[in-house]
């Protein structure tokens, strides 16, 4: 990911929930809710 605010191309498995997330500078997906997203699964818990 080149843009820290860019949305990930795939969903991440965060805390047992599949949820959209934002990309960080690494290639790995970190759990953080995107600013604008349509959830197809329950939101992740705030704390893991």
UniProtKB/Swiss-Prot annotation:
Insecticidal neurotoxin that reversibly inhibits the N-methyl-D-aspartate (NMDA)-subtype of ionotropic glutamate receptor (GRIN) and inhibits inactivation of insect sodium channels (Nav). Inhibits glutamate uptake in rat brain synaptosomes. In vivo, induces immediate excitatory effects when injected intrathoracically in houseflies and cockroaches. Disulfide bonds join 1-15, 8-21, 12-48, 14-31, 23-29. It is found in: Secreted. It comes from Phoneutria nigriventer (Brazilian armed spider). This is Delta-ctenitoxin-Pn1b. It comes from the Eukaryota. Coiled coil: none annotated. One of its GO terms (molecular function) is sodium channel regulator activity. Keywords: Disulfide bond, Ion channel impairing toxin, Ionotropic glutamate receptor inhibitor, Knottin, Neurotoxin, Postsynaptic neurotoxin, Secreted, Toxin, Voltage-gated sodium channel impairing toxin. Negative results: has no effect when intracerebroventricularly injected into mice. The presence of a 'disulfide through disulfide knot' structurally defines this protein as a knottin. Expressed by the venom gland. The keyword ATP-binding does not apply. Belongs to the neurotoxin 03 (Tx2) family. 05 subfamily. The keyword Secreted applies. GO terms for cellular component: extracellular region; host cell postsynaptic membrane.
């Amino acid at each position: 990911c080149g843009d820290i605010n860019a949305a990930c191309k795939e969903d991440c498995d965060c805390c047992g929930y599949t949820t959209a997330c934002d990309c960080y500078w690494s290639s790995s997906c970190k759990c953080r809710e995107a600013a604008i997203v349509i959830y197809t699964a329950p939101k992740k818990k705030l704390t893991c």
